[in-house]
Amino acid sequence: MSIEKVSILGKESIHVGYGIQSHIVEETIKCLASSTYVIISDTNMSKTPTYEKLQDSFQKELAKQRPQSRLLTYLIPPGENHKNRETKAEVEDFLLQQGCTRDTVILAVGGGVIGDMIGFVAATFMRGVRVVQVPTTLLSMVDSSVGGKTAIDTELGKNFIGAFHQPEFVFCDVSFLQTLPKRQLINGMAEVVKTAAIWDETEFTRLESFAKRFLAEISAPTPNLESIKDELIKTVLGSVRVKAFVVSADEKEGGLRNLLNFGHTIGHAIEAILTPEALHGECVSIGMIKEAELSRYLGILPPSAVARLSKCLAAYGLPISVDEKIFSKIIGAKKNNLKIDSLIKKMLIDKKNDGSKIRCVLLESIGKCYESKAHQIFKEDIQVVMTDEVFVHPFANRHPESVSITPPGSKSISNRALILAALGEGTTRIKNLLHSDDTKHMLDAVVLMKGATVSFEDSGDTVVVQGHGGKLFACKEEIYLGNAGTASRFLTAVAALVNSTQDEKSVTLTGNARMQERPIAALVDALTTNGSKVDYLNKQGSLPLKIEAGNGFKGGRIELAATTSSQYVSAILMCAPYAEKEVTLSLVGGKPISQLYIDMTIAMMKDFGVDVTKSETEEYTYHIPKSVYQNPQEYVVESDASSATYPLAFAALTNSSCTIPNIGSSSLQGDARFAVDVLKPMGCTVEQTSKSTTVTGPPIGTLKALPEIDMEPMTDAFLTASVVAAVSQGTTTISGIANQRVKECNRIKAMVDELAKFGVSADETEDGIRIHGVQLRDLKTPGGRGVKTYDDHRVAMSFSLLAGLCKDPVLIQERSTTGKTWPGWWDVLHSKFNAKLEGHEYIRQRSGSLRNGDRSIVIIGMRAAGKTTLSRWLAEHLNFKLLDLDQYLEKKLAVDIKLLVKEKGWDYFREKETEVLNECLEKFGKGHILATGGGIVEGEKPREALKNYTKSGGIVLHLHRDLKETVNFLSKDPTRPAYSDDIEEVWKRREKWYHECSNYHFYSTHCTSEAEFANLKLVFAKFVSKITGDDTFVLPATRSTFVTLTYPDLRKVPSLIKDVSETSNAVELRVDLLANQETAYIAEQIGLLRSVATDLPILYTVRTKSQCGQYPDEDEEGMRKLLMFGLKMGVDIIDLQLISSPSTIAEVISKRGHTKIIASHHDFTGDLKWDNVEWKNKYAQGVSIDADFVKLVGMAKTFDDNLLLENFRRQNTEKPLIGINMGPQGKLSRVLNKVLTPVTHELITDKPIGVGQLSLKEINQALFQIGGLLEKEFWVVGSPVSHSRSPALHNAAYAALGLPYKFDIFETDDAEKVYSQLMQKPTFGGLAVTIPLKLDIKKYCTELSESAKLIGAVNTVTPIADGRKGFLGDNTDWIGIANSFKKADFALASGVSNGLVVGGGGTSRAAIFALHSLGCQKIYLLNRTESKLQDLVDSFPDYDLEILLEKNASSVSIGLVVSCVPGDKPLDETLMKKLDGVLSNNKGDKQTRPLLLEAAYKPRVTPIMELAKEKYDWTVIPGVEMLVNQGEAQFKLHTGYTAPYKVIHSAVLNE
């Protein structure tokens, strides 16, 4: 057994080895005599063989050596969330109960949580007992166990309460690591890399070379760490020795020890927010990169060191950005909580700070810290580094008069050098290589294909490439290239040379979203013509590509169009020496684009030993011999001439001087001519030697425009030229840059659009741009979101120059995009040009939370799914135009579709259909409903267009109905072209396409009557309002409830649903309890539920078995699909279980749209008491994922469990909490819960036993009995009121809901009496006001609702804050009118766009308001006294009101009439004559449904009702309906509850 010992604080107390459990036991018992030894670990560790062996050995050895001593063990739950005061106290209580004294020796066996917390226990128990650290994770071995720092966490931060307490021994047994999962091993490597980065470059270099072997071993199906134990021991020792040395020099962290906190200032802040999902090492890894970038920003650390650190961490599988795909998946929705203010707040309470000053360790180079101490850093600098947007402040006169800038290596040369070196034989040292995203992707790809071995020297400045002579092999991993266009083109050609392996037969190249739009077809065509087999995996002509290995490169003559990108030409040139036959490459069709880049490639091939000869007989034709590149010993990459244009342009714009010391006239790069060909004619002084270039700008405001400049030799530099031209005198026209339209973005359009924000006019030409310069004083500061960079590095850098010339700071989005070619550009701007930068955090709105506004909506679905009808309704509802794409196609082609299909076939029709879809999405992107044909999803291209539309935030709505009904309908419809397949087969084929192309789904219930159609129209309108964001669920200010439906098939209980749900605020659909969980069945159930409970929000729940439901826990993918389908159905609320995988949680949260989220957790065992930290963690998790509500359900075993819950509720208020206990003893919790309490109903007979469910009535009765509800009194006031039905209505509802309220009459015509005798009573609950007090009562109201103000009358009074803040006057008469029409299916009424009000009194005003709310465009007025009507017209100036004259009465179109004249008095003959004309002209028939509402409820049938119904067949609504509907609205205002409609209706009618 080999054991390495490390001295710390003068004592060799750190022992490192492999399989040293026996040594741990012997040393502890021999050296640390004690009556009691206590092994403390966690419940996970205790199950491992290594722990069991240690405990058994200790027991046996103790019996031999110290038989009088005893061994105790104590286990705590695992995880950082248990490293707290409570757990520490539990451990201490255990020690006290066991009679432990000051001679006790504690062994802390576990990871950092155990080491930290048990070390702190040892430090404080009996004022300090001895402790032995036995770290079992890599992280704890190299970090927390060494140095005596012990602590626990609090809610305010990590490790804030603790002590320095040195362990007697630290035993690092590397064999313990065998028990760790892969992620935990990787996690530990962060601290290892950190230690080497701050202290020992030699060790850092060793770690770089060890990464591949380490990752391969721990990733094996059955890892065997013994095979790498020597390297692992070296790894642990390397870190431990550094930490021991530092601790020995600075035990209490006074100075030097602070260096160990590199990466922790930012890393700890990130960890505090992302724990427990993100691990310590992962956060420190990201923190190291951010702090290294901070050092670079401050001009201390070279960019190459940042790149090297980044590459090393990534090589170990550690995240280097929170945006990394895998890390983002792990942390899920918590990523949204990484707000800069929150992070800085966490940094401000870091232990190593000096007061409120943030201190941070700055790296000077790999292996060395700046000035060997932590430095004060400013929040402003952190903000720049931590955010991806930046404000560029005016340059003013802060910049130096002259400066020398060395840009990073040329991207073009760097990428070519890496390809040539990888294909070559031998080792080459590449200096000044560009360290950027592009070259990182290139390096990673070369290594993945085993084309070369890559290492670093000179602190990362030199890249050592050992080429394998063109021997490349297929790899399993996808090669991800981000948005690296150069890398994608070069590697596509290189991949054609790849050989297959036993397991892998192809190479896949992919990239980000923009890369998957960029063209590569011309290169792929050339390769496939030459024998390669390349498949497009997504969009034709773009990445991702699958390239079959082993086909080789045939060679011979290859022709490419001269207009082809020079990168395609270079790709083939560089691979040509490895073809089977010598290659002749001919560029045909004119002068090649970017000839200089082709010349560059040929010159570099020569440097690597291959001579390309130019044909003497054919223009633009090259002969490439078969050969193998020979790598030169050293290759120096020239600085990037395109990047050099930015500092040179800075000088031009600011009347300063800038020198680029390593780019001159001898450069191979076309952009090296920028200074001479562009800046000099614009008025700059230019001095250029063969190796350097200096530009001095003219006096500010004197730059001259360039009338004509062909920038074809330096196309990338046109953006820089454009921003200089923007402030030059005159118009500049740039040509020869057509290829810039297909770069990272359409750069020409981008320049036109973004220059406009600065007040600079520019327009596109056929192959360039024309810019009309402005005076500096006329340059505008872009408002709003500032400059959009389109994820294009050159757009960002160009506009960072123009931004500094504005009067105010300018926002630049996506600043990190410059990492493509110049990662340190912002650092140069800040530290070299003294520009003031300010980081800005864009707070993104929830995905989908924006209202749809006027954006067009696309409709898809099968034939006969109701697309025509529902599209028409949708257009009406949104006031959009309806465009039927089939009709548009017929009009465009001047042919009937049926005939078109018959003559030219379905394929031709589909092709034309696709063209029309793309055209309409482009032309009619706003204010339209685009209704498509059923087969739009048959083609890949239209499917892609639809999916892209949803990705961009547009709505694609899939309409569907019962398939049998669809079949029945289509079989009877001769007007449509016949399907060639069976309809059901067509549906089966298309179903998955409809789902993947749409982001919303609406199921239409089958309608057989006008009433059902009217209801469907109402349901559909509500659905549309939800998905467009116009009407989303809002939590009531009062107590709220939901009722749960547990039926397997709602079709069997439709009437029951309405009765049991109407008094709740939402209805829960338990999807897991349905008869089956097929999406079609669920859609049907939701459709039915919506049709029955039209006004109620739907809570969509899929509960797993472990959470008291029926859905299988193991079917995570099925759960994800069901939740996503719920979102697609546009449900109001969705229940998201907190035990779901982080990826499921993240997807639901990110795609929630306008659906509210309940984050839920259930414990039906009763083992978790409410003072257990697990509940706190679950609540915090719900908060962290940004759920709208958190629902936590426990099981009450005692009555006191309810009191513990209430204490928990008081302490956790960040998000609304639904907190209840199940079980009979938990009923009190349901009574006390205020937010969305689950309730049952008296009519539900099959209630679950033992759950403790209560009805709303039972809850209210119990709440009254314990003082939670107080008695209240309500009155109807006015005169006469003795026959009012209001008391009957309200008292019936109180009784039904168990409310301790009383409603009575108060007869008076004196408002003052009402105020003094009723409204001042402590039990006052509210008033129903009738004549003659509707106007007089207003003076006693401190507030009036908008409806009361406009109508001018109050019929409802409620106290504000129990009357302490006065009284609210409202009007519910208009709601009574509007809801009476709605309940009578007004949606299908003819001429609904126009209404008529008969009468001129107070109720007429409410009628006008109601008709307007129902969407009547014009409202006619009719009364005996026309002067009264003019007063009404004047009172509603914004409404289209018209007094109905006798001559027009028989000709106007009217669908809704409200009669507001007394029902028990004779009517004026003239008025009746006019009314007769209206009724006659609009009488009902089979197609029309005109409606008349009688406002008077006495007598039951009035003369007007009789005339309308009997003579003209109008549907009449008696006044009693208005009374009930008005009372229902009034009841809700008074109590906050919804009245049971049947109950109040019956109470009013049964006099």
Swiss-Prot record:
Pathway: Metabolic intermediate biosynthesis; chorismate biosynthesis; chorismate from D-erythrose 4-phosphate and phosphoenolpyruvate: step 2/7; Metabolic intermediate biosynthesis; chorismate biosynthesis; chorismate from D-erythrose 4-phosphate and phosphoenolpyruvate: step 3/7; Metabolic intermediate biosynthesis; chorismate biosynthesis; chorismate from D-erythrose 4-phosphate and phosphoenolpyruvate: step 4/7; Metabolic intermediate biosynthesis; chorismate biosynthesis; chorismate from D-erythrose 4-phosphate and phosphoenolpyruvate: step 5/7. The lineage of its organism: Eukaryota, Fungi, Dikarya, Ascomycota, Saccharomycotina. PROSITE patterns: EPSP_SYNTHASE_1, EPSP_SYNTHASE_2, SHIKIMATE_KINASE. It comes from Lodderomyces elongisporus (strain ATCC 11503 / CBS 2605 / JCM 1781 / NBRC 1676 / NRRL YB-4239) (Yeast). Residues 392-835 are annotated as: EPSP synthase. Pfam families: DHQ_synthase (PF01761), DHQS_C (PF24621), DHquinase_I (PF01487), EPSP_synthase (PF00275), SDH_C (PF18317), Shikimate_dh_N (PF08501), SKI (PF01202). The gene is ARO1-1. This is Pentafunctional AROM polypeptide 1. The active site is at E253 (proton acceptor), H268 (proton acceptor), H1162 (proton acceptor), K1191 (schiff-base intermediate with substrate). The keyword rRNA-binding does not apply.
